[in-house]
Each structure stands twice: as C-alpha cells, then as structure tokens.
A protein has these predicted regions:
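Short alpha-helical segments that sit at the start of domains
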Residues: 1-22, 28
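Short acidic, hydrophobic short linear motifs in intrinsically disordered regions
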Residues: 28-42
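Short amphipathic alpha-helical interaction segments
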Residues: 44-59
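A short, conserved structural fragment
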Residues: 58-68
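Minor-groove-contacting beta-hairpin "wing" of winged helix-turn-helix DNA-binding domains
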Residues: 70-75
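Short, amphipathic alpha-helical interaction segments positioned at domain boundaries
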Residues: 77-86
Length: 86
C-alpha cells in the first residue's frame, strides 16, 4: 500500500510541476502555445505520462490543447490563477 501511495503522490507532484513549468515557460502568457511533451520531459514525465497530464489539465480547463498528437498547449486564465494562488 505504501508503494501505491508513493506512486500516486509522485504522479500528483508531476501534474502540479507540469502546470508550474508551463507557466514559467510561457512567462504566464495565456496566448503562447508551447510543446507540452517538452514541458513534461522537464518535470520527469515520459511522453505517455505527459499526454495523461495534458489530458488531465485540459479536462480541468487549466490548459487549452491545440493538437493532442503534437502536444501543443497553452495556459488558460484559470491555469495562471491556479499557479499564482498555489
């Protein structure tokens, strides 16, 4: 059970780190698209996990996805607010 808890915590931490890294990458812009797979790689996620993270944040309306196959994403105003308010 502890190993599962650790895995869940790490997954949650990477999701939060992804949103923060995206925020830093685009300097809090809500109009600048960037490569979500690259952002995922910088926070330790492989392509499969990065796609799951992208899907998660898109579902929560924290990011907009231009193209899932290329992983092009941008922050939404809600995403900026989430990062800035912690």
């Amino acid at each position: 059970m502890a190993a599962m808890d650790d895995r869940l915590r790490e997954r949650q931490e990477r999701r939060v780190a992804f949103l923060r890294e995206l925020y830093d990458t685009v300097d809090s812009s809500v109009t600048t698209f960037t490569g979500g797979f690259d952002v995922g790689e910088r926070v330790g996620a492989d392509r499969t996990e990065a796609l799951r993270i992208i899907e998660y944040w898109a579902e929560k309306e924290m990011i907009k996805v231009d193209d899932y196959s290329s992983g092009m994403v941008r922050l939404t105003a809600a995403g900026v607010d989430a990062v800035e308010t912690g």
